[in-house]
């Protein structure tokens, strides 16, 4: 978003150079141990001109290459275009030499199918109806996933996103739903541990 706005005033070339420079600084911080992931990076999540869209993808590809060279995971802020979004991102990862399991799709839908994730780990927005969709696709999932609220502590925008209490609430709802699917307690416990801890370790460390 910032890149796109700046491109309107300083031009795409200068805006891109500025952002690539910022990514370089961020990667230095990660190397020094001040952070563990590069993000959010991505492309406009709203409609832009075809030329601007192509330049955004060019920049994202370069950022992925930089992350790959530094062996750093990235978190992606992108548009919601169904399964096509992750398919495009997976293709960019492959071109950049960045393992798909090191590119986390932020604010993803609760559709966990391989067709929808294309092998990318996803951070699922846990709004209403998310548990039902997760349970209906859970057996078709091959990617790691976690829960998120995209919590925004901004007094000027109350209710803009889900509050942090949503996660324990949804975790309990997921456990109850899995019991109804005849999962035993041990299997549920292992699965919840994967959702809240193990996938983070395997992705970011």
Residue ranges of model-derived segments:
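His/Asp/Glu-enriched short active-site or ligand-binding loop at hydrolase and phosphoryl-transfer sites
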Residues: 120-133, 151
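Mid-to-C-terminal alpha-helical segments outside catalytic/metal-binding sites
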Residues: 169-205
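Short loop/turn segments at strand-loop or loop-helix junctions that form parts
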Residues: 1-4, 38-45, 148-151
């Amino acid at each position: 978003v910032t890149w796109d706005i700046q491109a309107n005033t300083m031009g795409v070339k200068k805006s891109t150079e500025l952002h690539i420079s910022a990514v370089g600084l961020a990667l230095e911080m990660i190397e020094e141990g001040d952070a563990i992931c590069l993000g959010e990076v991505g492309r406009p999540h709203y409609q832009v001109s075809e030329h601007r869209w192509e330049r955004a993808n060019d920049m994202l590809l370069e950022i992925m290459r930089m992350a790959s060279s530094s062996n750093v995971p990235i978190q992606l802020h992108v548009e919601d275009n169904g399964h096509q979004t992750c398919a495009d991102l997976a293709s960019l990862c492959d071109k950049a030499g960045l393992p798909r399991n090191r590119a986390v799709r932020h604010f993803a839908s609760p559709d966990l199918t391989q067709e929808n994730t294309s092998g990318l780990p996803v951070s699922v927005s846990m709004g209403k109806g998310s548990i039902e969709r997760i349970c209906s696709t859970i057996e078709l999932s091959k990617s790691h996933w976690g829960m998120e609220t995209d919590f925004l502590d901004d007094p000027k925008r109350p209710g803009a996103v889900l509050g942090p209490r949503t996660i324990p609430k949804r975790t309990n709802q997921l456990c109850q739903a899995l019991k109804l699917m005849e999962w035993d307690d041990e299997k549920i416990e292992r699965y919840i541990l994967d959702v809240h801890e193990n996938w983070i370790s395997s992705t970011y460390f």
